[in-house]
Amino acid sequence: MDKQDEKKQGTTKSSSTLTTRCSHGNHISQSNSIPLDITIEILSRLPAKSIVRSRSVSKLWSSITTTPEFIKHRSKKTSPPCVLLIFRKHDKLIVFSSPQHQNTYSHVQDYHIEIPKNGFIRRLDSVHGLICLEGSKQLVICNPTLKRFFPLPEPQGTGDEYNVGGFLGYEPIEGKYKALCIVRGWNTQVLTLEIQESWRVTKPGYTHWPTKDTGRCINGVIYYKAIIFDRVPRHVIFGFDLRYEEFTHIEFPMRNYDRFLMVSYEGRLALISSTSSVVEIWSLEDAGNRKWSYEQFHLCLPPNTSLKGVIDAGELIYTGFSLNRSFCVVYFDPKKNNIRETKFQGIADNQIWQPDRLGFDLVNDFYVLPNHIESFISF
């Protein structure tokens, strides 16, 4: 075989193609072959709903769209971050999604997700497209894009009663999801998702228990409020580095820490407190030296609004305490001293408005998750 023929053969072998066949009675005709990379490109350009549906249409498409290569490729084409408004009603999560940079009126997309048995909500946050729910003895991962739940293995030493607290994190350098679990306050364990492995025991240095507040994953570190059971119990902020799997703890920069919401602000850990007229922001400037900075801003908000979070652009998110015919979300930019509103259409017509024997509580049954992105990952 000469070099030219060898080159042609090598080219043929390295070229992956997708061949489709059409059957008419006993006659089978072969259509033009579609290169695999073109198929991936076509599928990656589809809307999220279409990609999810394609998995049930074709086994080949299902295998393609579940590979790490496709998921990584699709993430580069993902839609802009959105804000999720999640209402819990009985065993359902009613989820509304809308672009968080849209002004005036926004028509929301909504869908319902059945909560698995023994799954309940105490802390809720969107971590790189996934949401973590706490079960009685295990953690459950929810992918809103796929509308699916993925129960994690039960941690070691859970016993018969509820004693599990946990958080989900994303390590951006290695691109890995990890779950952190605290069992009975002294047994801390970590699990790498996507890998068939068991929980690994870690040592935080202190016996502690997370508070009911939501944790935050910022630049590969899970931060959460906790109580250290030392000689005198005290409240601190724990940090868990996902890459090196090491713990640190940080003292609060103020005494009245209960009224401060822990968020990611300008890419850093921050504690924010807000009334209708004043916003206070403590930002962790230097985690190694425990150095905080303090800022105060004045604003004029509508009455009966509550701070729910911060979007990546630095705007603070507020919502009301009641459901009106046009549900409104208020955004405040402290740096620009600018306020904008988005009124959501479609929420008033949803079944959360239907009469309910148990009623509905916007304080305990309503969650706002900013900076949510699409994810096609499954476990």
Swiss-Prot record:
CDD domains listed in its UniProt record: F-box_AtFBW1-like
Biased composition regions of type Polar residues, renumbered to the chain: 11-26
Region (Disordered): 1-26
Domain F-box: 28-74
Superkingdom of this protein's organism: Eukaryota
InterPro entries: F-box-assoc_dom_typ3, F-box-assoc_interact_dom, F-box-like_dom_sf, F-box_dom
Pfam family, one: F-box
Protein name: F-box protein At5g18160
